[in-house]
Swiss-Prot record:
It is found in: Cytoplasm; Cytoplasm, Cytoskeleton, Spindle pole. InterPro entries: KIF11-like, KIF11-like_kin_motor_dom, Kinesin-assoc_MT-bd_dom, Kinesin_motor_CS, Kinesin_motor_dom, Kinesin_motor_dom_sf, P-loop_NTPase. One of its GO terms (molecular function) is protein kinase binding. GO terms for cellular component: ciliary basal body; cytosol; intracellular membrane-bounded organelle; kinesin complex; membrane; microtubule; mitotic spindle; nucleus. Motor protein required for establishing a bipolar spindle and thus contributing to chromosome congression during mitosis. Required in non-mitotic cells for transport of secretory proteins from the Golgi complex to the cell surface. This is Kinesin-like protein KIF11. Residues 364-480, 736-763 form a coiled coil. Residues 18-359 form the Kinesin motor domain.
Amino acid sequence: MASQPNSSAKKKEEKGKNIQVVVRCRPFNLAERKASAHSIVECDPVRKEVSVRTGGLADKSSRKTYTFDMVFGASTKQIDVYRSVVCPILDEVIMGYNCTIFAYGQTGTGKTFTMEGERSPNEEYTWEEDPLAGIIPRTLHQIFEKLTDNGTEFSVKVSLLEIYNEELFDLLNPSSDVSERLQMFDDPRNKRGVIIKGLEEITVHNKDEVYQILEKGAAKRTTAATLMNAYSSRSHSVFSVTIHMKETTIDGEELVKIGKLNLVDLAGSENIGRSGAVDKRAREAGNINQSLLTLGRVITALVERTPHVPYRESKLTRILQDSLGGRTRTSIIATISPASLNLEETLSTLEYAHRAKNILNKPEVNQKLTKKALIKEYTEEIERLKRDLAAAREKNGVYISEENFRVMSGKLTVQEEQIVELIEKIGAVEEELNRVTELFMDNKNELDQCKSDLQNKTQELETTQKHLQETKLQLVKEEYITSALESTEEKLHDAASKLLNTVEETTKDVSGLHSKLDRKKAVDQHNAEAQDIFGKNLNSLFNNMEELIKDGSSKQKAMLEVHKTLFGNLLSSSVSALDTITTVALGSLTSIPENVSTHVSQIFNMILKEQSLAAESKTVLQELINVLKTDLLSSLEMILSPTVVSILKINSQLKHIFKTSLTVADKIEDQKKELDGFLSILCNNLHELQENTICSLVESQKQCGNLTEDLKTIKQTHSQELCKLMNLWTERFCALEEKCENIQKPLSSVQENIQQKSKDIVNKMTFHSQKFCADSDGFSQELRNFNQEGTKLVEESVKHSDKLNGNLEKISQETEQRCESLNTRTVYFSEQWVSSLNEREQELHNLLEVVSQCCEASSSDITEKSDGRKAAHEKQHNIFLDQMTIDEDKLIAQNLELNETIKIGLTKLNCFLEQDLKLDIPTGTTPQRKSYLYPSTLVRTEPREHLLDQLKRKQPELLMMLNCSENNKEETIPDVDVEEAVLGQYTEEPLSQEPSVDAGVDCSSIGGVPFFQHKKSHGKDKENRGINTLERSKVEETTEHLVTKSRLPLRAQINL
């Protein structure tokens, strides 16, 4: 029984695989809606059924239902069709199979849309992302994606063939001649394959090249507009993809695996009357319908398994010969229209598709070629081409006219086709003859075997009846002995049960004793192991601890010695450094007073020079005032004589003089502002000097440079006006510059000692600046007052020109008074300047004294600080020494503590060894000694002879039993009849009941049974006789097998 599934699977593989048939229904188009057509097709994708209503709208009961491998309704998308139909086939192509997918159906039902698809409006998607893309672009996209992801080395070649009016054209031909026809020949390597001479195979490297090839081929394909479809395909197209993949075996040998995929877009069948095709279009429609009709006849012949299949009646069927009934995996996509206008065409398409489901193909993997075999094949092809080329160049062959060559080649092709057809017919007849002879011989042998088996069975039945009577007598004896054995068995069972109970008690007691021994042994073993391990670990731990203590104490002693030496060196170096600092500081402090005194003497000399200059300026001003006075008197005397006109001129001149005096006053005021700014800058610089005493000498030099530049800029701005007055100021500024330059040199050494005095200098400078500003304000105010009085005088002179002579003396007196007042004020100003210079001299004396005091104080501070620093270092050294002694004490204490811990650990060890070990404590479960009660003797059955003697003594009872058995004879004899009936049923039933054999059993392995089984349905007597003999032989084989099985228990019973 276990071998039956394997044999059935093997038969199924030998039988082949059915072609996959898929039905796709398109939605309504605009023309069908305008014609008010109604839907007659219902698609059920779940149950895979298509139902067609054939009785119109009113009659809903009359319908035809077809079942297919897959069904897609009107709402199905392109991607759904691709994933369901093409993806599994594509995997088989990569595995090395040849596969074919072609669309079949009426024109305008969506075959080209399913195979090629369309581009979305405005081309907003790429080829691979376009939802309207068909099977061909999606397939090529996935081929490149899968092969690239697998990482295998591969090459892809494509070709595009067109069958138009039963002529072959290459749509990928690079030449401009589109009408060049191709020739088709049989493939010598594949009996069912064909070779198309001159067909261009283009190697593609990526998806973009494939899309360009598809566009190029679609542009060359013949299409035209009909009433059924605006872009009706007028030809069949075959798009072939050949994939060469390289594989490496375990031994390192390189193999080439070849897979081929044919994507066929058939032209649709059409009704010329409905499509409106005339002239050329009508001839095209006739050729299309003729090729599709041949395809239908081929499908019918393959389904009915006729000996001759008309592949050669059309070039389309000849190309698809291997796909229909060959070694190719084939899928058909049947497209239909849901409209009632196309009812006849829809039913025809569904009938063809449903019939094609029964076609059996035997897909085989293409033979994998080794690298050497492939190179050898290419080399032979190259040599053949070289020979042809050499013959053509040397002109050694036979040359005939082109017309004769065409006639001869046509005859050869016709003869070759006839020869192939005759060979196929002869092969079919010979195969049929061989099958019939084999069936006849098998049936004859089976009949002879059945006769011999029947004779053997009759003899066995006779001997069995003889043995039956003997067996009955033996049965009575055995029953009596069996009853005696049963009673003995009961007694033995009771004794055995008692013994078993006793054994159970003893085993429990023994197990308790053993468990006690195990506990004791476990405790002893645990204590021994724990004691041993603990002792070893503790000894190693203490040894390590002692070594660590010794190493730590030695390292700490060495560290303390290093600390002592380091701190001694540090103390000596710090004392020497302090000594050098003290000597340098004292030397610098002794040099500071000398430098200050020299600079102060220079400043005194400058002040004396300024005093002399002030005296000279005083005399010069007095002389100028006198000259001004004399000039004024002479001018007044000269003015008295002219007329009123000259007075007006003088009035204008006075106005001009007053304007100039205003400008002079403004300039003096500006000078005062600039001087205020200069003094404020100087004060700020002094404040910065006070705050930034730690800054370097470079910054102080930069500040002095800025001060010099400011003085130079002030001197340049005021050099053009008030020449005499500015000469004094320039000299004074030059003196200040020299003082600043002289003071700048010792600033680097004195700047730390004059921090306190700088505040006083700033205050004094601010006081003098305020005083100078007040004096300048008074001078400018007087000039302004003078200006106002002059203006009033001019106005009065203008108004009172008639009274000029009377007031002339008064004017002269007022001028004299003003000159005197000016003289006095100038003298007062000079005296004030001299007094300010004296005050500065006094301040410099005070500054010198303060600097000397500061130097002395700083020197004393330095010596005190150095002494304090030395004392601090000595104190720190003593502290470190004390700390080291404390550390030594701590180390000693730590060693003592470690020794104490070691002692404690030893005490704990002793405690563990004495107290912590486990002891064997009694649990009270140990069994006590006791006595067991059990039977000491066993019952035995009496010997067979004694039992038979007892049976003879009971003869009357035996006779009664025999009488009872004779009365029951009627029951025992039918039992034998039943056995004979069963045996007869196995031998006779198959001969009388032929319908018990399943007509659907796969019998292909017994020589062409499916072919004749199919013939039986057509009522041919010869085939019926053959199948009847086959059935009888098979049934007799099974009968023999069953009889042998039923005989074995009977023989065993007889032997008993």
